[in-house]
Amino acid sequence: MILILLISFYGVCNARNIRTTSYHVTIHKKAGNHKKLKIILLADLHLGYNIGCSQMKQMVMKVNQQSPDLIVVAGDIFDNEYDALDDPDQLVKIFRQLKSQYGVYAVYGNHDIDEKILAGFTFGSGREKKVSDPRMDEFVKRAGMKLLRDESVVLIKASISMEDQMLRK
């Protein structure tokens, strides 16, 4: 029992730490006149029970310091339940402070849709149609993110494409 409590405590504390990792990727394709494109990838935000306004303010500040060309939010924006957000309107204002030349694009992950999850893992047949909470959809829109659902977007004669397996019919 003590081990479980210690592991849970470690997980909660670790979730609040913002980690950055830099990668330099060479792609042998033309992207307009761009020689370099700085893309910031945010993943597994899990807004709600453990992550709120304070952590997001720090994250937005770190992202904006990098002067990205593009910001991509790669799923698990929410921690399963919209009602877990401590102050949705304030979080929207914080997200709207993200700055990039080509905008902020997002896809949903398994924690952003109506799916059976136990201890962070998805279970079930996988055959059911996955739907998102309309309040989450509205939050993402108000936050200034373009939600991609099995679609691609052309940026500077280069394209970004993100498949959303969770919402595929």
Regions found by a protein language model. Give the residues of each.
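Non-catalytic terminal accessory segments
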Residues: 1-16
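Soluble catalytic domains of enzymes that build or remodel membrane lipids, polysaccharides, and related
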Residues: 33-169
